[in-house]
């Protein structure tokens, strides 16, 4: 049966056009119930002994997804009209529901009500899309009641007052979420129920246990219509709110409209905005702008603490100068100029896009009565210091006080000091290493689940070996006669020979984006049979590779470059240590060692040439742990040693990436995936320039290796070549006009994309259609499009899974750092120690030090917390020195000091490494 659906739309040119689509209706769509006597039950997903089948409306799924994911909620019919609405309203919830529908252990069945002849409904004249969809849900529920008869109760779950009223009038069984959960006899499930706030929503009779004193704390958010108009007129400024990681009462909003960061001080001015929210900001009067002064943790922050949340812990900032509050006396010839240097300050007037998600932390009991029904109120304290405390109610407080739990945010009323949320699940005991490691993964959105059977089915059977078909492939060169060897990390395997576009394996890799390296484990982007048994380069084993081959002069000048898929047979698989030992042993003169020395000589010349062009050595200190094989606890900690062998491999990998970038850009100028590192601004480099001047260095900021410390905010990112002009392709840190990622397809999905682009440029394979769509490729590369805009209207977007390359890359880095921090805490909890440290940044109440022995950077206080020094300590900006007012004691940048390292817990369940001056 054919129906025509028509609607009008506005074109890019501003014209209105009518679109007519054919809509096919069928009568052979099955209900999914095993007990059905009419439908084919071979593909039934629901339980055969279910007494009740649930039908959920869209808003229930949107607001109660944490509850729905609980195994107690099962035998659910998911209507296609609900899926369509979810896809347009919230991509994250849509994907979570789809995962439930595809899970073999959950009883969720998708019913295509929009294509069933008896359940499809046309919109009536004057009926809103929302009302039409609610009616479609009720019609489908009624159909199920008639279709299955009295053997099974069909229950519509809705919190919409009007939808429930109409359902009851139409003879449909309907309940609210809370009443249904109560009927299950599992009181702990009620902790998962999100309490709706709208007057159009049905609420059970629950006493409001919030404090009766309803004082207005925050300003009302402006409506979107007013925000849009204000942005257009330049009254408001849009940007992402970034809360200071070490002082949660200070935030920044990067504004393109004024070309600067707007500073937001205090929770009142943040106006219920969370870190990562897209907000509209109004500038404060200029006489209220923040004055640039010496850096401190005191005074202004202390005022916020006393006024808003006195038990909040505030830290001296160990990273960027822009991450610390400023308040201290300043000396030197630039003092007056510093006092007059004001930066834009503002307040949040509206939330354009929320960044709420689930948070890990623990409970802090509130001094309130238990209330009715065993309900207790508590404040949830996130491990992420940027997140405000969250008010929840729970029926299992006694069991949760010593646990790490997950809580989701539901709302934040302007009358409440804290946002309201609900308990999601328990992770484990506080302080347990496995629990805290899982927290690291959850906080950074790292997917660590096992690979599914569908993904593993994409792999070739083991044992795998190079076949005669591979050797006879005209697009693959036989290089087995060439003396090939690898130095860890391995050379460029031909991963894309096994990871084909559009397969479950490719979808999974694109969602993971990158492998994640923790202290005690590695979370792979691709399954281990592929990375360890099929693609990894081993001695005397034939492998498929994607090769970049240069002809070079003895001076490391490239005469020619070619690219080919190949078959290789490695004569040796060396670690960095083994390769270095060979090069250093003068007794060895075998061909392999000679090759290593020759390559190292070329690499040194290549490296020097990059440095001469202005390249920077940006690698920060890497901490290495010795881990107990049984307990997995750290036994020792130190800095990872970089050898010439490491630098040799790095040079050739960089050269390969540059060569591939040039090749793919030449063939695909509008859709190549490249990587750039923008030039840092003068403001970013200012702290480094001050430090250099204090020790008598005339710093050339275009080429010094010392820039690493000042480039915290100049981040390398992926981009699509069609979105920027060639001068913007520059990778500043490498001093390379073009750069991409090609050499690590086993652990980075970006490299998989580049492999496909390179293969297409060589006419080995066709370019996948996704790469021919520039807007779509941009959405893949740019995390902000994916993460902060669920309504992505991108051609064929639903044909692939979004990759979030920059987002996944950054999260993997943050997870690695958090894992190092966790194991550092575990180690020093048992091994407090004294050691040497070097001062690297000056603050008005202390300084930041670097501990060479352990590769640790952290704050050392000269004043007690909450004490602004009272003028006792002053900062000399010119000489980068902090000293007592009477001049009796002073500390200078780059000075060595002796410190004590130990773990303390100033707040419950928030251990930190404390550095104390000896």
Predicted segments — roles?
Residues 1-217:
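Noncatalytic, typically N-terminal accessory segments of nucleic acid-processing enzymes
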Residues 50-58, 72-74, 152-155, 159, ...:
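Core residues of folded domains in eukaryotic genome-function proteins
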Residues 54-55, 77, 155-157, 173, ...:
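Beta-strand cores of modular interaction/reader domains in eukaryotic scaffold and signaling proteins
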Residues 57-64, 79-81, 157-159, 177, ...:
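Structured beta-strand/turn binding interfaces of compact recognition modules in eukaryotic regulators
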Residues 62-64, 69-72, 83-88, 94, ...:
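Eukaryotic short linear interaction motifs
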Residues 66-69, 89-91, 168-171, 179, ...:
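Short coil/turn segments at secondary-structure boundaries
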Residues 199-496, 502-541, 873, 879-892, ...:
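Charge-lined substrate channels and their catalytic hotspots, especially those that engage the 3′ end
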Residues 384-386, 411-414, 429, 433, ...:
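Electropositive polyanion-binding surfaces
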């Amino acid at each position: 049966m054919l129906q025509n659906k028509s609607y009008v739309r506005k074109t890019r040119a501003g014209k209105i056009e009518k679109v007519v689509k054919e809509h096919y209706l069928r009568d052979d769509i099955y209900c999914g119930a095993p007990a059905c006597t009419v439908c084919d039950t071979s593909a039934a997903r629901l339980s055969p002994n279910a007494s009740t089948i649930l039908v959920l409306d869209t808003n229930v799924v949107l607001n109660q997804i944490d509850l729905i994911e609980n195994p107690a909620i099962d035998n659910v019919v998911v209507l296609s009209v609900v899926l369509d609405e979810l896809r347009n309203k919230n991509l994250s919830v849509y994907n979570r529901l789809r995962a439930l529908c595809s899970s073999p252990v959950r009883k969720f069945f998708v019913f295509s009500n929009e294509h069933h002849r008896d359940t499809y409904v046309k919109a009536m004249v004057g009926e809103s899309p929302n009302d039409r969809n609610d009616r479609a849900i009720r019609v489908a529920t009624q159909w199920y009641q008639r279709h299955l008869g009295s053997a099974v109760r069909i229950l519509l779950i809705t919190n919409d007052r009007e939808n429930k009223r109409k359902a009851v009038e139409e003879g449909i069984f309907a309940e609210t979420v809370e009443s249904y959960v109560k009927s299950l006899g599992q009181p702990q499930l009620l902790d998962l129920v999100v309490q709706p706030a709208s007057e159009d929503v049905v609420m059970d009779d629950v006493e409001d246990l919030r404090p009766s004193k309803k004082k207005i704390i925050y300003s009302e958010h402006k409506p979107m219509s007013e925000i849009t108009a204000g942005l257009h007129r330049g009254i408001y400024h849009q940007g992402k709110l970034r809360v200071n990681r070490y002082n949660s009462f200070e935030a920044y909003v990067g504004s393109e409209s004024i070309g600067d960061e707007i500073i937001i001080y205090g929770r009142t001015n943040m106006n219920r905005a969370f870190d990562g929210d897209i907000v509209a900001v109004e500038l404060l009067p200029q006489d209220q702008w923040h004055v640039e002064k010496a850096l401190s943790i005191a005074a202004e922050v202390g005022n916020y603490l006393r006024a808003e949340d006195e038990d909040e812990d505030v830290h001296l900032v160990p990273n960027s100068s822009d991450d610390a509050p400023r308040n201290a006396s300043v000396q030197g010839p630039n003092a007056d100029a510093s006092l007059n240097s004001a930066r834009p300050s503002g307040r949040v007037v509206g939330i354009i896009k929320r960044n709420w998600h689930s948070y890990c932390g623990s409970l802090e009991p509130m001094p309130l009565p238990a209330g009715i029904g065993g309900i207790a109120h508590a404040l949830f304290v996130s491990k992420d210091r940027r997140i405000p405390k969250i008010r929840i109610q729970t029926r299992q407080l006694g069991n949760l006080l010593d646990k790490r739990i997950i809580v989701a945010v539901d709302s934040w009323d302007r009358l409440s000091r804290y946002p309201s949320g609900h308990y999601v699940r328990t992770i484990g005991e506080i302080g347990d290493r496995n629990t805290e490691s899982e927290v690291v993964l959850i906080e950074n959105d790292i997917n660590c689940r096992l690979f599914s059977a569908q993904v593993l089915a994409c792999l070739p059977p083991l044992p795998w070996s190079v076949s005669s078909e591979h050797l006879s492939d005209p697009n693959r060169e036989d290089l087995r006669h060439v003396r090939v060897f690898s130095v860890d990390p391995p050379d460029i395997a031909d991963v894309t020979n096994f990871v084909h576009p559009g397969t479950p394996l490719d979808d999974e890799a694109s969602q993971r984006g990158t492998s994640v390296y923790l202290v005690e484990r590695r979370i792979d982007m691709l399954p281990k049979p592929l990375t360890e048994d099929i693609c990894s380069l081993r001695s005397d084993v034939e492998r498929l590779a994607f090769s970049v081959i240069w002809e070079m002069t003895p001076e490391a000048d490239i005469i020619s470059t070619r690219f080919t898929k190949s078959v290789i047979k490695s004569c040796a698989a060396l670690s960095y240590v083994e390769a270095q030992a060979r090069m250093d042993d003068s007794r060895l003169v075998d061909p392999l060692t000679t090759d290593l020395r020759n390559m190292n000589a070329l690499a040194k010349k290549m490296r020097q040439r990059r440095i001469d062009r202005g390249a920077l050595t940006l690698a920060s200190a890497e901490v290495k742990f010795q881990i107990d094989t049984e307990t997995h606890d750290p036994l020792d900690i130190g800095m990872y040693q970089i050898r010439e062998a490491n630098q040799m491999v790095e040079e050739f990998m960089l050269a390969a990436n540059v060569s591939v970038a040039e090749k793919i850009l030449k063939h695909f100028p509008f859709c190549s995936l490249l990587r750039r590192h923008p030039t840092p601004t003068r403001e970013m480099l200012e702290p480094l320039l001050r430090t250099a001047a204090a020790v008598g260095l005339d710093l050339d900021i275009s080429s010094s290796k010392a820039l690493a410390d000042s480039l915290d905010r100049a981040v390398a990112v992926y981009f699509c070549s069609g979105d920027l002009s060639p001068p913007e392709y520059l990778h500043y840190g490498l001093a390379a006009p073009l750069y991409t990622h090609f050499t690590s397809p086993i652990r980075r999905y970006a490299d998989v994309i580049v492999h496909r682009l390179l293969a297409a440029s060589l006419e080995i394979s066709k370019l996948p259609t996704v790469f021919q769509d520039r807007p779509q490729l941009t959405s893949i590369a740019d995390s902000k499009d994916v993460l902060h805009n669920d309504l992505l209207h991108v051609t064929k977007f639903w044909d692939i899974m979004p990759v979030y390359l920059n987002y996944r890359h950054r999260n993997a880095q943050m997870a690695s750092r958090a894992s190092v921090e966790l194991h550092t805490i575990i180690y020093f909890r048992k091994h407090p120690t004294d050691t040497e440290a070097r001062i690297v940044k000056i603050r008005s109440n202390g300084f930041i030090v670097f501990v060479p022995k352990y590769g640790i950077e952290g704050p050392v206080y000269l004043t007690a917390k909450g004490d602004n020094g009272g003028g006792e300590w002053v900062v000399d900006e010119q000489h980068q020195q902090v000293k007592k007012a009477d001049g009796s004691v002073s500390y200078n940048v780059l000075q060595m000091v002796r410190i004590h390292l130990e773990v303390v817990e100033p707040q419950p369940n928030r251990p930190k490494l404390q550095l104390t001056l000896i």
